[in-house]
Amino acid sequence: MGVEGHEAVAALAWHYMTPDTRTKVDAILATDHDALTAPDFIARSTWADHWRTTGHPETGAWHFINMEIDHPDMASACQAPAQGGGQACVTSQLEHFEHVLSDPATTVADRAVALKYVIHFVGDMHQPLHAADHEDRGGNCVRISLGGARTTNLHSYWDTVVVTEIDPDARHLADRLFDQISVTQKDAWQAGTVAQWAMDSFGLAKHTCTISTRLRDAPPMARPCRCPPGMMPRHARLQPGNWKRPGCGWHSC
């Protein structure tokens, strides 16, 4: 998920926090003097990406779970370090940092880091191509044309293009989404588990977000495929549902 998407999810989560929860969040972030982003809750939603790209590539695998499109297996795609083997991924790390955040014994510094990761990973897990792989690095190896000279890869299309086509202002987008969420939707999403969220994103990736096998198997630098007619408007209607849910997934809803 790109900057705008993460900030929209965080802004939506802020809408649903109780005053007491907001006070606690602000108190945690007030102890954090990291300069990679601005210090507020919404800006901190992108901290994990800045940290990864400024000398911490070992955290890269934490942002996704590569479940094979044709044979999804969450257990083999991701294992928490304590289980041995495999590698940590977005589901195991989200659960880990949620535990760190809620543990009374956690240090002040570790609690701030955990909060920043939780903000970020809740968003990443709801970007469909962070939950599935089609032998194309989650769509990163599939180039697509957006019309004219505009090209991108399929992963970036879902990270950023769909978001900015709908509303480039993250806070305004969050306000719009907040107005559309019913109490029934909120309660259902809040009751979900991390594993359920991941499988929901996987299902969306499999049935909606991927390009055909023929295009997937084309060389990475081949001429970009054109988006099918109507794809962008259809995705623009679909994607907001996957921002509403992570924004509502905080226990403070």
Regions found by a protein language model. Name each.
Residues 1-121, 128-244, 248-253:
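N-terminal, motif-rich segments that launch catalysis or mediate targeting to/interaction with membranes
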